[in-house]
């Protein structure tokens, strides 16, 4: 039926294996969004003497990376929302990571264009408050 209004002919459809079932990736089987196969390849290429890497190890590492990424993005999104902007910048990532104690200990790297955390030393703050009180009394 070329050119007609019917069922289209041809095309692969979903890829199938020899038994006729549709193929599912390791990521889909594990319910993950990050690519397990790619991370397994990175693990194999970056080990000494090209050591063997099990499939479950790659899935586990993928799940950990996906969880940490989701956690950081959620906190950075909250920081961006507090500042009433719609785009997450390195500043928001910095505020999110340094605001969470566990992420701060895990990620000790310097974030480019992240700025510094707003913090005033208590000793300086107390002197300013004392000056204000003395002016009010006088």
Swiss-Prot record:
Q: Name one GO molecular function term.
A: protein heterodimerization activity
Q: What is its main location?
A: nucleus
Q: Which InterPro entries match?
A: Histone-fold (IPR009072), Histone_H2A (IPR002119), Histone_H2A/H2B/H3 (IPR007125), Histone_H2A_C (IPR032454)
Q: Where is this region: Disordered?
A: 1-32
Q: Report the CDD domains cross-referenced here.
A: HFD_H2A
Instruction: Quote a single Gene Ontology cellular component term.
Output: nucleosome
Q: Which UniProt keywords apply?
A: Acetylation, Chromosome, DNA-binding, Nucleosome core, Nucleus
Post-translational modifications reported in the UniProt record: Acetylated once deposited into chromatin.
Location within or outside the cell: Nucleus; Chromosome
Q: N6-acetyllysine-modified residues are where?
A: 5, 12
Residue ranges, compositional bias (Gly residues): 1-13
Question: Which purpose does this protein serve, as stated in its record?
Answer: Variant histone H2A which can replace H2A in some nucleosomes. Nucleosomes wrap and compact DNA into chromatin, limiting DNA accessibility to the cellular machineries which require DNA as a template. Histones thereby play a central role in transcription regulation, DNA repair, DNA replication and chromosomal stability. DNA accessibility is regulated via a complex set of post-translational modifications of histones, also called histone code, and nucleosome remodeling.
Q: State the similarity comment.
A: Belongs to the histone H2A family.
Q: How does it assemble?
A: The nucleosome is a histone octamer containing two molecules each of H2A, H2B, H3 and H4 assembled in one H3-H4 heterotetramer and two H2A-H2B heterodimers. The octamer wraps approximately 147 bp of DNA. H2A or its variant H2A.Z forms a heterodimer with H2B. H2A.Z associates with the VPS72/SWC2 subunit of the SWR1 chromatin remodeling complex. Also interacts with RBP1/DNA-directed RNA polymerase II largest subunit.
Can you name this protein?
A: Histone H2A.Z
| Record organism | Coccidioides immitis (strain RS)
| High-level lineage | Eukaryota, Fungi, Dikarya, Ascomycota, Pezizomycotina
């Amino acid at each position: 039926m070329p050119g007609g209004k019917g069922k289209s002919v041809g095309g692969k459809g979903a890829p199938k294996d020899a038994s006729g079932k549709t193929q599912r990736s390791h990521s889909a089987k594990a319910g993950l969004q990050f690519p397990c196969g790619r991370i397994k390849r990175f693990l194999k290429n970056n080990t000494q003497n090209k050591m063997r890497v099990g499939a479950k190890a790659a899935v586990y590492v993928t799940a950990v990376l996906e969880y940490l990424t989701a956690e950081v993005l959620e906190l950075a999104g909250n920081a961006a929302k507090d500042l009433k902007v719609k785009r997450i910048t390195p500043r928001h990532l910095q505020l999110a990571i340094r605001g969470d104690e566990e992420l701060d200990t895990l990620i000790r790297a310097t974030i480019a264009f992240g700025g510094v955390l707003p913090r005033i030393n208590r000793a300086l703050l107390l002197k300013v408050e004392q000056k204000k009180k003395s002016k009010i009394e006088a």
